Structures are given as structure tokens and as C-alpha cells.
Amino acid sequence: SFGNFSLREPENLTPEIQLNLEKVFRAAQEFAEHPHGWLVMMGTYGCGKTHLAAAIVNYLKGMGDNPVFVVVPDLLDHLRATFSPSSSTSYDDLFNRVKSAPILILDDLGTQSATPWAREKLYQIFNERYNAKLPTVITMSGNLEDLDARIRSRMLDTRVCMIYEILAPSYRGGSTRPARTKRK
């Protein structure tokens, strides 16, 4: 939730990084309160992107909305699994549910296999959502330059998309990690 997201004040982050983290936090809150366009949160693993995306989902669910949250590699695995004769889910149903969700959160874009099939499916999702102007949240650890050019062009449209890079290091490790009390 937004309430348990740590702005990490005890870690003595630089003022620039602290302000950046607060700015991204406010952008995520604003998106949750007024979902429109696309919100992209980029940064290293463990910097808080997925936490903020999940906080958006929780807030929206609390307001009665039904956002769809998917981890991109898992989504592609689920789509592939629908081709199995034993699958109880239809490919079209799953794909259309994601493409046309009133609010979609795509977590970990760029960590999926870059097969031609995966690139095409992701492009179709992005293109549908772009053309329909559907609110979308995207988290990614990589660079925009590493994405399919067709997806990147939609993400770089500043009329639709706000891109924020979280400068904070991972909270999971390194010298800025807060000390934890050992349990007995």
C-alpha cells in the first residue's frame, strides 16, 4: 500500500535521490487517484517500482475498480499455456482481458524472452491500449532502448506517457540497506 511504502529517510540517501523517490511516490498516488494515460516507473531491482504498482492496484480495488496486474514474463507463459489441449482458459479470452482491461499494470517489462512471438504479443497489447487510450502502469528495470521500437515509440509519446526513473538503490542489499533486528 502507499501507507507502508518507505521513502527511506533513515538510509541517508542524497537529497537528489530522496526528492526523486518522493516525486515518483506522488506520481503513483496521483495516478491511483486519477488513472489516465500511462505511468512508467524505471529503476534498479528492489528500488520500489513493484511496491508502488501494487499500491496503485490496492488503492483502485479499494475504490471499487478492477485493475489487472500481470508480470510480463508470467503473462507470456500463461498465453503460451493456453495452446495446450488441457488448458481451461482460451487464448483469446486471456489476451483480450489483458489488452482491454480498464486499468492494466504490467510489471517487469523487459525481463521477458525476446522471441518474435513475445515481441509481437506485447506490441499488440501496447498498440491496443495506446489507440484506446487505456490507463496503463508499466514497471521496468532495463532501458527503453532495449524495447521493441514500436513499443518504445508509444512510451515516448509525452501526450500519453509519463516516465519516471527511480534513482534509489535497491533496498534489498548494499551499504544503504537499513539494519534489521535479528529474531531469536
Task: Name each model-derived stretch.
Residues 4-39:
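Pre-Walker A (pre-P-loop) alpha-helix and adjacent loop at the N terminus of AAA/AAA+ ATPase modules
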Residues 14-22, 61-100:
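Short glycine-rich substrate-engagement loop in P-loop NTPases that contacts/grips substrate
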Residues 37, 65-66, 100-103, 132-138:
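Loop/turn-to-beta-strand initiation segments
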Residues 51-65:
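P-loop NTPase Walker A phosphate-binding motif
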Residues 35-53:
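Walker A/P-loop nucleotide-binding motif
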Residues 28-32, 78-104, 120-128, 150-151:
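Conserved alpha-helical scaffold flanking the Walker A/P-loop in AAA+ ATPase domains
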